[in-house]
C-alpha cells in the first residue's frame, strides 16, 4: 500500500513535466527559426552593401553597416535566450531526478525501519518497542505535517493513509534542492555553482566563467546592450 501511495505522489509531482518540456522545446525551435531568418537578412544586407558600396556616401555606408551590426546583435540575443532556456530545462529535469533520488532513499529507509521493528517484536520486545516507537513517530509526524502546511502550497489529497505517506508528503521542497548534485554537472558564476534560475552571459569572448546568476551580479532583469562581468570589468580597468 505504501509503495502505491509513494508512486502516486511522485507521478503527481511530474504530471506537468511533459507539457513544460514541450513548451520549452517549442520556444527553442522558434528561437532557432528567428536566428535563421535574421542570418538570411544579414546575407541580403551584406550583399547589397558590397554591390553598392562604391556609390554610397559616407553616411549611407555607416547606416548600412549599422543595420548589419544590429542584425548580428539580434542573432546573439536569440542565441543567448536559447542557451538560457536550455539551462532552465536541464535544471527542471535535474530537480525531478534529485527529488526521485530523495524519495527512493526515504522509501528504502522506511522499509528498513519496518523490517528492524518487525524483527525486534518477534524476539520478545514487542510492547516496549512498539509503544516507544509509536510515540516518537506521532511527534515526528505532527511536526512534519505542520511544516508542510505552513511552508508549502496545498497539494492534492490522496485516498487512504500510512506513516510512510505522511512522511513523504511532509518533505519540504528545500530538502530536495539540498540533495547532492551530479558531480559531472558543469559549474558557473562567481559562486562556482551549477546553473539555476535566470543567468546572463558575459560579452567578453575570453571570459573564463561566461555565465552568471542574476543574484550573484546584482541583476534583476537582463540589461540592454553588452554586459561584462565584474571580473572582466576589473581586468579591463587594470589594462588602462
UniProtKB/Swiss-Prot annotation:
The modification N6-acetyllysine is found at residue 114. The record marks 188, 199, 203, 211 as: Histone H3K4me3 binding. Residues 116-165 are annotated as: Disordered. Zn(2+) 1 binds at residues 189, 191, 213, 216. A zinc finger (PHD-type) spans 186-235. The modification Phosphoserine is found at residue 118. One of its GO terms (cellular component) is nucleoplasm. Zn(2+) 2 binds at residues 202, 207, 229, 232. It is found in: Nucleus; Chromosome. Component of the HBO1 complex, which specifically mediates acetylation of histone H3 at 'Lys-14' (H3K14ac) and, to a lower extent, acetylation of histone H4. Component of the MOZ/MORF complex which has a histone H3 acetyltransferase activity. Through chromatin acetylation it may regulate DNA replication and may function as a transcriptional coactivator. Inhibits cell growth, induces a delay in S-phase progression and enhances Fas-induced apoptosis in an INCA1-dependent manner. The PHD-type zinc finger mediates the binding to H3K4me3. This is Inhibitor of growth protein 5.
Amino acid at each position: 500500500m505504501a509503495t502505491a501511495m509513494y508512486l502516486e505522489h511522485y507521478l503527481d509531482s511530474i504530471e506537468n513535466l511533459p507539457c513544460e518540456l514541450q513548451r520549452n522545446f517549442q520556444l527553442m525551435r522558434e528561437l532557432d527559426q528567428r536566428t535563421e531568418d535574421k542570418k538570411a537578412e544579414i546575407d541580403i544586407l551584406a550583399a547589397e552593401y558590397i554591390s553598392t558600396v562604391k556609390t554610397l556616401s559616407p553616411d549611407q555606408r555607416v547606416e548600412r553597416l549599422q543595420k548589419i551590426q544590429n542584425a548580428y546583435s539580434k542573432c546573439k540575443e536569440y542565441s543567448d535566450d536559447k542557451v538560457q532556456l536550455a539551462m532552465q530545462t536541464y535544471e527542471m529535469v535535474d530537480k525531478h531526478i534529485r527529488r526521485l533520488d530523495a524519495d527512493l532513499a526515504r522509501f528504502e529507509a522506511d522499509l528498513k525501519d519496518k523490517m528492524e521493528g518487525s524483527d525486534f517484536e518477534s524476539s520478545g520486545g514487542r510492547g516496549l518497542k512498539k509503544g516507544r516507537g509509536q510515540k516518537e513517530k506521532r511527534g515526528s509526524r505532527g511536526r512534519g505535517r505542520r511544516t508542510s502546511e505552513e511552508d508549502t502550497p496545498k497539494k492534492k489529497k490522496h485516498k487512504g493513509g500510512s506513516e510512510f505517506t505522511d512522511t513523504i508528503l511532509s518533505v519540504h521542497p528545500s530538502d530536495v534542492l539540498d540533495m547532492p548534485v551530479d558531480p559531472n554537472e558543469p559549474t558557473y558564476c562567481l559562486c562556482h555553482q551549477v546553473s539555476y534560475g535566470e543567468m546572463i552571459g558575459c560579452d567578453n569572448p575570453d571570459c573564463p566563467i561566461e555565465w552568471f546568476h542574476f543574484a550573484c551580479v546584482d541583476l534583476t532583469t537582463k540589461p540592454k546592450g553588452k554586459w561584462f562581468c565584474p571580473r572582466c570589468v576589473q581586468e579591463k580597468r587594470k589594462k588602462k
